[in-house]
């Protein structure tokens, strides 16, 4: 159901402030039966105290049984139907990087990967190289591959193993399958067109993959590329129009900046490299008076899960917990903490499991949940929500929705 027409009628501007904190991939699983999840293993005294004052529940970001990507997971949290408002990873990276991304262009998100002599994937992320190494390799590709046939090829560094390619030329469609096999021990997949208009794009992507491998054959780790999320530039309703908010985003990684800008948030500058939690906290404090909705993104919980690093994910949760008192001191009227999907270290991948949701607001019914964990969230008064149901709840608790109906 598309609630946007209804919310557009009911939304009203108020001075109250909403803070949505997304701990990327926060949901987890025990490493062994009966053991703790990452959240249960973490020492989180500040989150524990907050949970006692808040309402908890579980949230299925997109749909039961579906393991969502960060794109649909976030869009649902922002109130956008992820089955209607579809955007590829390439477009999100292009928007987040501020790349020269024009109508008719096709953007693809790339991973530098390590391939063995037989062309099989050894490491899908090339050992997560420093961004400086990425920049060096991208410079090499820019010089060696300015175009494929008569189509311009534009390379951009994103971060670590991530990069962006923008294809510019005539007759390019974006209905193209990914080349990332999503596991090691297999060669990169061949891109395939899903419609007639995208046949040329698929062929060019395959040629580009071969050419990149030739250029990078002497690189010890970054000697191949995996592509996904081919997409053109989309146009979505803006949060200002639908919710009457003045929204801001605090994120470090281009994809999440792209998601935020796509729905109308102003992306605030963040000092520091990587997840830069201290820089994000500084940006939140310095801009607190200018906006009434803040999206605050924490990435490394997801990265540790994808690497299968259970204890690393525990540490990232604990690092966030240490910042929480300074965040709470700002006094948000409505605070929500949740995830865009689960990334259990046990699975080393996004999963279909619900994520915990914590909501603190003035008019909440008390519940029995005492920690921000998956098991405790099951006891909470919020029940089990879908991702798209979160934004109306935040708006209501912030006093930003009028009564519906007579």
UniProtKB/Swiss-Prot annotation:
- GO aspect biological process, one term: glycolytic process
Molecular function, one GO term = metal ion binding
Q: Which domain of life is it from?
A: Bacteria
Which is one Pfam family of this protein? PhosphMutase
Q: Which reaction does it catalyse?
A: (2R)-2-phosphoglycerate = (2R)-3-phosphoglycerate
Q: Keywords for this entry? A: Glycolysis, Isomerase
Q: Which CDD domains match?
A: iPGM_like
| Enzyme Commission number | 5.4.2.12
Q: In which pathway does it act?
A: Carbohydrate degradation; glycolysis; pyruvate from D-glyceraldehyde 3-phosphate: step 3/5
Top class in the EC scheme: isomerase
Read off the InterPro entries from this record: Alkaline_phosphatase_core_sf (IPR017850), ApgAM_prokaryotes (IPR023665), Metalloenzyme (IPR006124), Pglycerate_mutase_ApgM (IPR004456), Pglycerate_mutase_ApgM_sf (IPR042253)
Tell me which family the UniProt entry assigns to this protein.
Belongs to the BPG-independent phosphoglycerate mutase family. A-PGAM subfamily.
NCBIfam families to which the protein is assigned, alphabetical: apgM (TIGR00306), PRK04135.1 (NF003160)
This molecule's function is given as: Catalyzes the interconversion of 2-phosphoglycerate and 3-phosphoglycerate.
Q: What is this protein called?
A: Probable 2,3-bisphosphoglycerate-independent phosphoglycerate mutase
Where does this protein come from, organism-wise? Thermus thermophilus (strain ATCC BAA-163 / DSM 7039 / HB27)
């Amino acid at each position: 159901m598309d609630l946007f027409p209804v919310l557009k009628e009911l939304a009203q501007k108020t001075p109250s402030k909403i803070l949505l904190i997304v701990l990327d991939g926060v949901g987890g699983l025990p490493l062994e039966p009966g053991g703790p999840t990452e959240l249960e293993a973490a020492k989180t005294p500040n989150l524990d105290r907050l949970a006692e004052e808040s309402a908890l529940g579980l949230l299925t970001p997109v749909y039961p049984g579906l393991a969502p990507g960060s794109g649909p997971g976030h869009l649902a949290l922002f109130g956008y139907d992820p089955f209607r408002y579809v955007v590829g990873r390439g477009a999100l990276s292009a928007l987040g990087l501020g790349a020269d991304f024009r109508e008719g262009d096709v953007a693809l998100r790339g991973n530098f990967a390590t391939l063995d002599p037989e062309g099989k994937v050894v490491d899908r992320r090339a050992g997560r190289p420093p961004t400086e190494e990425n920049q060096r390799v991208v410079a090499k590709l820019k010089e060696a591959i300015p175009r494929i046939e008569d189509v311009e090829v534009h390379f951009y560094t994103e971060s670590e193993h991530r990069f962006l390619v923008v294809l510019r030329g005539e007759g390019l469609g974006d209905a193209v399958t990914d080349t990332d096999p999503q596991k090691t021990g297999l060669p990169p997949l061949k891109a395939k067109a899903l419609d007639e208009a995208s046949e040329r794009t698929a062929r060019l992507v395959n040629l580009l993959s071969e050419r990149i491998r030739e250029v990078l054959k002497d690189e010890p780790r970054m000697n191949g590329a995996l592509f996904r999320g081919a997409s053109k530039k989309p146009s979505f309703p803006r949060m200002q129009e639908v919710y009457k908010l003045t929204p801001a985003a605090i994120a470090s990684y281009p994809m999440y900046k792209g998601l935020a800008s796509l729905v109308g948030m102003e992306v605030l500058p963040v000092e520091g490299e990587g997840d830069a939690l201290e820089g994000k906290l500084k940006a939140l404090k310095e801009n607190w008076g200018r906006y009434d909705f803040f999206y605050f993104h924490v990435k490394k919980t997801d990265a540790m899960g994808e690497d299968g690093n259970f204890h690393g994910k525990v540490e990232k949760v604990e690092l966030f917990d240490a910042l929480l008192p300074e965040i709470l001191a700002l006094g948000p009227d409505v605070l929500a903490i949740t995830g865009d999907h689960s990334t259990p270290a046990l699975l080393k991948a996004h999963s279909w499991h619900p994520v915990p949701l914590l909501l603190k607001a003035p008019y909440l019914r008390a519940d029995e949940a005492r920690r921000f964990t998956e098991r405790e969230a099951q006891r909470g008064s919020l029940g089990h929500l879908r991702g798209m149901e979160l934004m109306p709840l935040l708006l209501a608790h912030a006093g930003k929705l009028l009564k519906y109906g007579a």
